[in-house]
Structure formats: C-alpha cells, structure tokens
Amino acid sequence: MSQGFKTEADVMRNTAHRVDDTNQEVSAELSRLRSIVDGVRASWEGTAQVSFDNLMQRWDASAKGLQDALQSISDNIRGNATSFENVEADNQSAFSAVGGQGLAL
C-alpha cells in the first residue's frame, strides 16, 4: 500500500533556500566563466569577433534563463509552503468548529 505524499512547510522552505543557494553558486560560476571568456575576446577580429559576440549574447540569455528558472522554482516552493500552511489552518478550524457536538449524521 502506498504511503502517499507527506510534507511540511518548514521542509518546503528549507528546500527553497537550498534552491536559492544553488542559484547563487551557479551565478557565481557563470560569472567566473564569463570573465575568462571575455579575456579571449580580443583575440578575435572581424567577422569572427562578431560571431563570438553573438555567441556570448546567446550565452548571456541562456544564463539568465537558468537563473530565472531556479528563482521561479524557489518562489513556487515558498508559495506552496504558504498554501500548505493555510490549508492546514483551515482544516484545523473546520475540525475545531465541530467541537464536542460530533457530526450530525
């Protein structure tokens, strides 16, 4: 028998924080690589340099896309944690409203 899906809001927020950390690490590494690559730009001339510049524009767009995707994942996880807490609070209120009267069946 399946145990189902279980989670807690604090676990979700911790996961979102880990995604943020990963995003920062990826950003730092991409910046480091970009600095290295920028150092060889001067070795290209003419149409080769134009091609190189076009390639680097695509690199920048892809890097931003990756960073945006990681940020979106983190934001979604945080939003889900808040929704999870709200549903839990609503459920608790609903059960408390029944109180000692039991269910009218």
From Swiss-Prot:
Residues 7-21 have a biased composition (Basic and acidic residues). Residues 1-23 are annotated as: Disordered. InterPro entries: ESAT-6-like_sf, T7SS_ESAT-6-like. Belongs to the WXG100 family. CFP-10 subfamily. To improve expression in E.coli the proteins were cloned as a single protein in the order esxB-esxA with a cleavable thrombin tag. Forms a tight 1:1 complex with EsxB. This is ESAT-6-like protein EsxB. It comes from Corynebacterium diphtheriae (strain ATCC 700971 / NCTC 13129 / Biotype gravis). The lineage of its organism: Bacteria, Bacillati, Actinomycetota, Actinomycetes, Mycobacteriales. The gene is esxB.
